A protein has these predicted regions:
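Canonical Radical SAM [4Fe-4S] cluster-binding loop centered on the CxxxCxxC motif
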Residues: 1-37
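Glycine-centered loop/turn positions within well-structured domains
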Residues: 11, 15, 123, 237
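A short, flexible beta-alpha/helix-coil linker loop
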Residues: 24-28, 121-123, 186-187
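Short cysteine/histidine-rich metal-coordination sites, predominantly Zn2+-binding motifs
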Residues: 33-39, 237-240
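Radical SAM/AdoMet-radical enzyme domain recognition
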Residues: 37-62, 68-184
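A structural signal for short, well-ordered beta-strand segments and their strand-loop junctions
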Residues: 115-117, 152-154, 178-182, 207-212, ...
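Flexible glycine/acidic-rich beta-alpha junction loops that bind and position SAM and/or redox cofactors
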Residues: 178-197, 210-221, 246
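Accessory C-terminal segments flanking Radical SAM cores
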Residues: 209-277
Length: 277
């Protein structure tokens, strides 16, 4: 049964991160109209039908959600009762350059968690993320001033981070917040074994996200075809890394009708990497 979803509310970004794996999927990214309100209504109906106590929802995907902040607010308002009751646990992930006090206050008031992408050491972050380090750090401190603690942080782990693992771990220790380390994939990617070895080390010192059947990119097992889905480009996909695979249905499909014929595979591995071998 589906209990979590991510919605990509746009396909555009104000940065040009060198490692962004969507650069390699341009033919699969398109601006087909997608009724996010209908999607949210389907999620609401699914929650009611199955009496779900918790549904996890991310406003995250192919682009920078803060570029369409007015639209994001309208989606949040549409499910505000479910957010405030805790039935939907919602979050968004931003590159951190478009944050301001009012936006932080709005999302916090509506119980939408904010994750900020920060690749650790300044020279590593700037190499990959369009020299945005200073702006991102300023806004992380702004978040702390507004909310009283640091936000969840997302760090993409490539060879640069592996080569300076101890320094990177020490860098994140100052924040005391939950860290999601993401395995760099695509042409600059690292192996799953390298990534998991880094996670094992980081988890000795940091509050590191390591899920169950979620995603190998974040240190869990692959949940493709199980309980989570990804909305983008007018479609529902088996996962955000698989928008270029033939596993999709229309974005307005009721959740009970979303069935992907994912074959049996070893879920310590990434389905995308298994399917494209």
């Amino acid at each position: 049964m589906i209990t979590r979803a991510c919605i990509s509310i746009n396909n555009r970004c104000n940065l040009d991160c060198k490692y962004c794996h969507f650069h390699e999927k341009q033919e699969s990214i398109c601006d087909i109209p997608m009724d996010v309100f209908k999607i949210l209504d389907n999620i609401r109906a699914h929650i009611a039908k199955h009496d779900l106590k918790l549904f996890k929802l991310g406003f995250v995907g192919n682009g920078e959600p803060f570029l369409d902040f007015v639209a994001l607010c309208s989606y949040i308002k549409h499910i505000d009762d479910l957010l405030l009751s805790g039935t939907i646990a919602a979050y968004t992930i931003t590159n951190g350059t478009l944050i301001n006090r009012e936006r932080i206050e709005y999302l916090s008031a509506h119980k939408v968690n904010i994750g900020i992408s920060l690749d650790g050491l300044e020279e590593i972050h700037n190499k990959w993320r369009s020299h945005s380090y200073k702006k991102v750090m300023q806004n992380i401190e702004l978040y702390h001033d507004v909310v009283g603690h640091y936000p969840a942080l997302n760090c993409t782990v490539g060879k640069d981070v592996l080569d300076r693992a101890d320094e990177t771990i020490a860098f994140f220790a100052r924040f005391g917040s939950r860290i999601t380390f993401s395995r760099m994939i695509g042409q600059y990617g690292i192996s799953l074994d390298e990534f998991n070895a880094f996670l094992d080390k980081a988890a000795l010192y940091l509050n590191v996200r390591r899920g169950g059947y979620d995603c190998t990119i974040y240190g869990g097992k692959c949940g493709a075809g199980m309980d989570n889905i990804f909305y983008a480009n007018g479609f529902i996909y088996v996962c955000g890394n698989c928008i270029d695979l033939p596993y999709a249905c229309s974005s307005d499909t009721p959740l009970d009708e979303v069935l992907f014929p994912v074959p049996m595979f070893y879920r310590n591995l990434c389905f995308k990497e298994v399917a494209t071998r």
